[in-house]
């Protein structure tokens, strides 16, 4: 997962300090379809191997990621937090500028997940993802990659999201 964070940082360096989009609607369908690019497609040139998107602690359950959205990569892999890359933003790059991340050391970008390419925070009633989205395949916890590049294991109940602090969102500094 650390390599994914490094790849996202390298991508941002090449694209004016902007994080990769969750998804780029190449066919104009308005929905994720075969041939569209996802965040994994965007950073693939920086990791050189699609196997990096597979958590080594979980066996592959679907076809390997080939850079197209219709595969959804590995269902036992990693997902990106959509707070930092709105799905409805204009096409490339459309992600959040790094300068907009007020507290990078406590802002989650990628995590262990088994439900597809990304986690849709908009579907949560509070407007942010809750800890139920994380897959706890590592000793009842989950690995989280933060915007500053570090990766840390936490029990899913340790990830805070309240009115004053939310590791899933771009919070105010200070």
Which positions does each model-derived feature cover?
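Short, well-structured segments within or immediately adjacent to enzyme catalytic domains
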Residues: 1-174
């Amino acid at each position: 997962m650390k390599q994914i964070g490094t790849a996202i940082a390298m991508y941002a360096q090449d694209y004016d300090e902007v994080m990769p989009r969750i998804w780029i609607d190449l066919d104009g369908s308005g929905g994720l379809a075969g041939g569209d690019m996802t965040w994994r497609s965007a950073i693939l040139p920086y990791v050189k191997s699609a196997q990096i998107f597979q958590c080594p602690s979980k066996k592959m359950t679907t076809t390997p990621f080939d850079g197209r959205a219709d595969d959804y990569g590995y269902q036992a892999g990693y997902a990106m937090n959509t707070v930092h890359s709105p799905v409805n933003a204009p096409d490339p790059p459309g992600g959040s500028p790094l300068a907009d991340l007020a507290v990078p050391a406590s802002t989650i970008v990628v995590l262990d997940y088994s439900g597809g390419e990304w986690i849709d925070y908009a579907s949560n009633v509070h407007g942010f993802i809750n800890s139920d989205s994380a897959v706890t395949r590592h000793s009842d916890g989950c690995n989280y990659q933060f915007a500053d590049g570090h990766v840390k294991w936490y029990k899913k109940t340790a990830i805070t999201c309240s009115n004053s602090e939310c590791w899933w969102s771009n919070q105010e500094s200070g």
